[in-house]
């Protein structure tokens, strides 16, 4: 692998999983060095907890792949934190990465509290600090998660990574936590 610092992912669609040999697709991903599956329910037009994906999640759990999903956007409600809680609870050994601190656009700590309690949940901070002026709710949300379960993310190409990094460093977070 030319860039071992990057962890590549594939994707799969709920309709494809229901109609095709998704196990072969996941095996192909693993054979080609992909370690996880990224889904974006808003763009792919299905719910994060669509039961057609449950056999896929079960196979991912069995083969130690991880799931990363866009999470949030209360305007459409196909990927809210409640849906990620359902998946992470049904598959407790599946590592799940919820993007945008677990609830893009709904910056209320209470909404993500059930998500933050699950040991197999990780989050990234992509597109979290770019849309709001008051950072306090976001910092409160971050405080609910195990700091070892929070990843930097830029949401590239929507946001330039260096600008997101600058905003993150300007938050005044203790340097040890930023590591």
Language-model features: locations:
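Mid-to-C-terminal alpha-helical segments outside catalytic/metal-binding sites
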Residues: 144-151, 158-179
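Cofactor-binding loop segments of dinucleotide-utilizing enzymes, especially the Rossmann-like FAD-
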Residues: 11-13, 101, 155
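Catalytic pocket-lining loop regions of alpha/beta-barrel enzymes
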Residues: 35-36, 46-151
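A short, conserved beta-strand element in the Rossmann-like catalytic core
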Residues: 47, 157-158
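Short secondary-structure boundary segments
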Residues: 41, 127, 154-156
């Amino acid at each position: 692998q030319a860039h071992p610092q990057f962890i590549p992912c594939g994707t799969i669609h709920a309709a494809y999983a229901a109609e095709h040999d998704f196990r072969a697709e996941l095996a192909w991903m693993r054979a080609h060095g992909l370690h996880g599956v990224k889904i974006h329910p808003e763009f792919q037009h299905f719910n994060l907890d669509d039961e057609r994906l449950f056999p896929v999640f079960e196979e991912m759990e069995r083969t130690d792949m991880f799931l990363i999903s866009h999470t949030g956007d209360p305007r459409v409600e196909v990927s809210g934190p409640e849906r990620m809680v359902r998946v992470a609870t049904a598959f407790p050994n599946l590592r799940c990465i919820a993007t945008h601190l677990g609830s893009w656009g709904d910056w209320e700590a209470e909404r993500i509290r059930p998500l933050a309690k699950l040991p197999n949940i990780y989050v990234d901070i992509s597109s979290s600090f770019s849309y709001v002026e008051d950072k306090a709710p976001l910092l409160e949300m971050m405080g609910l998660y195990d700091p070892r379960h929070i990843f930097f993310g830029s949401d590239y190409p929507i946001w330039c990574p260096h600008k997101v990094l600058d905003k993150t460093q300007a938050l005044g977070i203790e340097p040890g936590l930023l590591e």
